[in-house]
């Protein structure tokens, strides 16, 4: 996912 969330 986008930066600040999960790596995807």
From Swiss-Prot:
It is found in: Secreted. The keyword Secreted applies. One of its GO terms (biological process) is vasodilation. Expressed by the skin glands. Produces in vitro relaxation of rat arterial smooth muscle and constriction of intestinal smooth muscle. May target bradykinin receptors (BDKRB). Belongs to the bradykinin-related peptide family. Keywords: Amphibian defense peptide, G-protein coupled receptor impairing toxin, Secreted, Toxin, Vasoactive, Vasodilator. This is Des-Arg9-bradykinin.
